[in-house]
Amino acid sequence: MNNKIGFTLLFLFGFVLGLILLTNDARAQQPASGSKPAQPSATAQNPEGPYTITSSIEFGVRGIAIDGNADIYRSQLNYTPGFRIFDASLFMQSKDNDAPVFDSLMISSFGWGNDPNRHLRVNAEKTKAYRFDANYRRFDYFNSLTNIALGQHRSNTEYRQGDFDLTILPQNQRAKFYLGYSLNRNSGPAVSTIRFNGDEYPAAYPVRAASDEYRVGADARVSVFDISFMQGWRFFKDDTEYLITVPHPGNNPTNTAKINDFFRSAPTRGETPFTRLSVHTLINRRLDFTGRYIYTSGTTRYTFFQNGTGTDSSNNKVNSDIITQNGGSKRPYGMGDVAATFFVTDRFRISETFRVNNFRINGADLLSEVLLRSRVTAGGETTLPPVLTNTLAFRTIKYRRFLNLIEADLDISRWLSVHAGYRYTDRHVEVGFDDISIGTPAGPEVETFDNRTNTFIFGFKAKPVKIWSLYFDLERGESDNVFTRVDNYDFTNVRVRSILRPNRTLSFNASVVTKDNANPSVTEDNRAFGVNVKGRVFTSSVDWSPSQKWSASGGYTHSRVTSDAEIILAFSGSPSTPGQSRYFSRDNFFFVNGFCQLSSRAQLFAGYRFHKDPGQGNRLSTQKLLIGSFKYESQAPEAKFVLKVNKNVDWIAGYQYVAYQEQFPKGDFYRAHLPYTSLRISFGRPE
């Protein structure tokens, strides 16, 4: 109730303030009787300073009223009530490109205050000297959804990301230089689960992760070659911990395991230097050649410490269970490719690309565990023999992949062009692993895997009539996956797109995308054990802009995904039996937007969005067939009114409504009302 009263008062305050400003502006436009016409000021006629400046700021309040599950609302939208700066911008342009520090400066931002997404952008340039580009973003990530994890996987963290790039001599065609820096931070409270003594327990999970990247590079023109070089260094760290400070019986109430306290820490450090070199040239306007080489060498190190006390599943008292671990890995990676395009004629082109990927991952760690337990009986407490574990583990992955792609493009006429190609890959993978218990002989094992894929590509662009464009793309073949060594994916991807423009104000867009993906595999007992996924996306939209005073657009998208996986069903007391798991997604999305210039001072924007996924429909699971889907429905109408109070001030009032409903017997829902009002103050904009 307090939230509803609060946002209502704030909304009325903004409305009244806008009317007051409108009244004052109307009075100011009425000349006093007998007064002389105002003379133009000298400042307006002869503006001083080296820059032309345009700026604006929009500030106001947002109200929130939520009915239903507030955690789902925060996990999806996370807007909060109160004051905020919706957006702000500043643009400075030198009048003669001869300003002392910069010739142009643009600063823009939105969302600062209480919005979950905030962005700041800065662009500055001094002609022929430098160009600076900066982007800084902050995201509030809240996740607290009802799921099979009993609501014990939650987070309320903040992401901070930034990219800062400086280009020296940006207009110089012979040489230019680059400096860059990027940051990524994630921190905040979270809850996760841990396994201990045969049961599962919720644990505090404070997230602390960060990465920094530094870059330096140059572009140069040497004779007929364009050369580009980049050297970078990326550093990463993660200091996330798991904490349990109060006793907990565990999620399984049928066993005797419980925990008294628990601590886990695994600080991780990583660094990845990377190098990129590329060369490009055009020979006699017939042969376009590009060569590129990338090399990285990533290193990761970590230390692990864990200790917990409680009771295990055998009703033994766990006095201490200390696990320490130290390890690291290294991943040198190299990728080189060369590509050439030969212009046989003005209408016919042949392209050839050859690429080599090669990497190796070497890692090892040493694990030590000391488990101290005792048994409490009627006769007292008996100390059990300690359990000591010392294991040394090694892992090695070697990966090499060749790729060759040949393509041809033919422009048959102004109305028709055709594209065809063939892609071939050859992959070799070696996996080595060795787990050594201290005091026992080693038994290293190595697995080797080789495979090849073939893919055919075809497409065309047609213009049957002047107002109609038609696009078609087809890919059919096999695809490998570096982390899946069972078999190739058999896939067929088709895309058709149509654009119809009867005139300059009206356009119709329609497209169809189909993706058939099969991952066949056979286990050692000759049992089929694969996955088939079929996806279909139908999209259509209409855009109509008959004049600058009003416009409308709308569209409909239907996305359907069906997956069919062979699985093994294991029931307590019964032998494992083969089964199937099928998942259905049938998402329908509709939207409509409109704009109307009500008068020279007033504008109205309105829109409506609707989502519905009926999922599996009336299909039901059987003993050997598991059927799943996620049924939901959501709608979001919104409207915004903009009133130009005077040359420098706009009053804005808007309203958004979001309704979300999960279509389950006990499905969660929420309904959110989000009114807002704001003032936009501008300087330097035209009448």
Regions found by a protein language model. Give the residues of each.
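Boundary at the C-terminal end of the N-terminal hydrophobic targeting segment
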Residues: 26-28
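Bacterial N-terminal signal peptides that target proteins for export
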Residues: 1-12
